[in-house]
């Protein structure tokens, strides 16, 4: 997740830009930079690595970076390596424009070949294409140049732009990527995250898709996609801790959905490198996994249970060991057939879930090996487990989990690779492929967010008036369908049910009527053709079928009403990408229904009672 900040003010702007970038560090980054207009010329400073490196470099070049107007950026590499050359801001060849960018420009290479053949490029980024395209269209009017350039671009983006011909202004625009403008006591700002600006209160504007914003030290002007000035009413915002923590997003849930690339990156890097999985807090002898392990039982509640449903298939496929997935509130009252050769796994975001804790204590009575996956290191489940895998999702405010779910899921992937290596049930070649895909998941999740947000928003318009919605899938996709269904019901309050696709004909298909929405999850596995058959069955009875699948299934659009594509990865990990548009679909459906998204009725974040 990249971060943008810009300010047109009355004092020296460089220190405030650096401070703002430090406030954006939590989003994840690998390089950072600023640009300031100094004596009607653009001066920039960029560094790879930590922002403290940028701070030191900026201080050493302070005289050249003196100015009242500037922009800054934290970059997480998507196009090009994390080098100084690829860091933002990027500048035009004539040095008139500097630009920072969040998002992905999907047709950057096509634009290079069609419109920028005479331009020289110095980075591997799509962003450099944008700044040079704006410069190409610029005559005397920046708004017109930005408008014309944006019409050529495909993808999602938020831009902060400097032009040396207008040394007291910043220009900004957005398309599918959040950006806000704020008029405060010390000047006017643009930012992707309210927590980055040094103001206690201000007039707050969301930059809508296609709008162009022009800010100076004491004014904010807006133009529509045709370049015509428009009037917008500000929201008066007190930058309280809650408002700041939302980071410019309307709800914590949406913010946490978009934090998933960073949460997954931090979690994955805590146990994986390109050669192996290292679980520091798992102290089970290798010979147990190879010679003694008889079965694995995963126990959890709610969304954590759904990660178990997905993880079961990953572990069984890679480790060749039977896995049962149990609902903690049921399991705790059972008489489990377990012993010292059973590995029991307990999944809980808070580490305090009452039923999961009771299940853990039950298993310890049978001398089973216990391992927990938790997000809170000081939690009781972590303390009472023999072994622990910690997730690094960070604090999750919204009741409906998103980033913690995704962090639990990649932890199960890691556990599967770890056990498979001990049991020698995967080849070195397969292990290497899995590790490479695991390490690439954060970037693929980021791409999924950028590519599917608008599609999920549009699809929500087709389903939000429905009284019933069905989610279907097979194997890995069934667990994903369960999670999509739970998200939909808990925040939209629409009756939503999930089913294994093959079970439809055993009763549920009688509920399908003309226009009933069916969300089908279909990853590229050996059972996709079976899911396609189930889709045909419900289509024949009048259902509106919306398919979520990966890019390898390009022909699938011919037999469904609409489709959302996500990037492809190895089948074992595809759920991590397929779940993203389901989270977004639930969010935008609930938003259309004006639900209390962060605090849905009757639900609590941590269920610490039976």
Would you name each region that the model predicts?
Residues 1-250, 259-294, 333, 428, ...:
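Conserved short alpha-helical segments that host acidic/polar catalytic motifs at enzyme active sites
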Residues 68, 72-85, 275-287, 311-347, ...:
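Glycine-rich oxoanion-binding loops at beta->alpha junctions
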Residues 24-33, 102-106, 172-181, 249-253, ...:
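Conserved phosphate/anionic-ligand binding catalytic regions in large, soluble enzymes, centered on
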Residues 544, 557-559, 569-610:
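Generic C-terminus detector
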Residues 260-264, 268-297, 387-517, 527, ...:
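Active-site phosphate/pyrophosphate-binding segments
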Residues 153-187, 459, 464-490, 532:
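Acidic/histidine-rich
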Residues 291-432, 436-440, 474, 521-565, ...:
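Glycine-rich phosphate-binding loops that contact phosphosugars or nucleotide phosphates
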């Amino acid at each position: 997740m990249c971060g943008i900040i810009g300010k047109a003010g009355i004092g020296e702007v460089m220190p405030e830009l650096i401070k703002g970038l430090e406030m954006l560090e939590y989003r994840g980054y690998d390089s950072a930079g600023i640009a300031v207009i100094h004596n009607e010329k653009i001066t920039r400073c960029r560094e790879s690595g930590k922002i403290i490196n940028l701070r030191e470099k900026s201080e050493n070049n302070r005289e050249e970076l003196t100015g009242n107007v500037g922009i800054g950026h934290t970059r997480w590499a998507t196009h090009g390596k994390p080098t100084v050359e690829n860091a933002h801001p990027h500048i035009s060849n004539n040095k008139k424009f500097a630009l920072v960018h969040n998002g992905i420009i999907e047709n950057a290479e096509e634009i290079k070949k069609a419109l920028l053949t005479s331009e020289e490029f110095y980075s591997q980024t799509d962003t450099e294409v944008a700044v040079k395209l704006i410069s190409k269209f610029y005559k005397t009017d920046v708004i017109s140049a930005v408008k014309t350039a944006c019409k050529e671009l495909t993808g999602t983006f938020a831009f902060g732009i400097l032009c040396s011909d207008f040394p007291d202004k910043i220009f900004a625009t957005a398309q599918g990527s959040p950006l806000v403008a704020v008029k405060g006591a010390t000047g006017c700002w643009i930012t992707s995250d309210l927590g980055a600006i040094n103001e206690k209160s201000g007039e707050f504007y969301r930059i809508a898709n296609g709008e162009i914003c022009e800010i100076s030290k004491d004014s904010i002007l807006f133009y529509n996609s045709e370049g015509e000035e428009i009037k917008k009413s500000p929201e008066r915002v007190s930058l309280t801790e809650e408002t700041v923590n939302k980071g410019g997003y309307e709800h914590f849930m949406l913010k946490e959905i978009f934090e998933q690339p960073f949460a997954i990156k931090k979690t994955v890097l805590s146990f994986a490198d390109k050669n192996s999985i290292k679980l520091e807090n798992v102290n089970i002898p290798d010979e147990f996994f190879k010679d003694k392990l008889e079965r694995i039982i995963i126990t959890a509640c709610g969304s954590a249970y759904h990660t178990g449903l997905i993880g079961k298939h990953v572990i069984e496929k890679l480790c060749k060991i039977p896995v049962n997935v149990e609902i903690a509130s049921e399991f705790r009252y059972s008489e489990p057939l377990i012993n010292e050769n059973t590995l029991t796994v307990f999944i809980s975001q808070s580490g305090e879930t009452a039923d999961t804790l009771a299940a853990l204590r039950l298993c310890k009575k049978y001398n089973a090996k216990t391992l927990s996956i938790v997000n809170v290191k000081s939690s009781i489940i972590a303390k009472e487990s023999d072994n622990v895998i910690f997730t690094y999702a960070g604090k999750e405010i919204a009741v409906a989990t998103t980033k913690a779910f995704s962090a639990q899921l990649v932890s199960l992937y890691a556990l599967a690779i770890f056990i498979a290596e001990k049991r020698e049930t995967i080849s070195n070649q397969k292990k290497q492929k899995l590790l490479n895909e695991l390490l690439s998941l954060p970037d693929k999740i980021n791409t999924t967010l950028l590519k599917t947000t608008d599609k999920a928003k549009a699809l929500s318009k087709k389903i939000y008036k429905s009284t019933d919605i069905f989610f279907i899938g097979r194997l890995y996709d069934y667990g994903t369908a369960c999670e999509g269904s739970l998200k939909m019901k808990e925040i939209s309050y629409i009756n939503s049910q999930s089913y294994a696709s093959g079970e439809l004909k055993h009763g549920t298909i009688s509920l399908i009527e003309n226009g009933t929405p069916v969300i089908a999850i279909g990853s590229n596995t050996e059972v996709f053709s079976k899911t396609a058959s189930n889709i045909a069955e419900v289509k024949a009875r009048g259902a509106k079928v919306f398919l979520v699948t990966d890019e390898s299934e390009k022909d699938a659009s011919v037999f469904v009403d609409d489709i959302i594509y996500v990037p492809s990865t190895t089948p074992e990990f595809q759920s991590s990408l397929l779940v993203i548009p389901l989270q977004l679909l639930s969010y935008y459906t609930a938003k259309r229904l004006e639900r209390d998204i962060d605090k849905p009725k009757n639900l609590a974040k941590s269920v610490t009672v039976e």
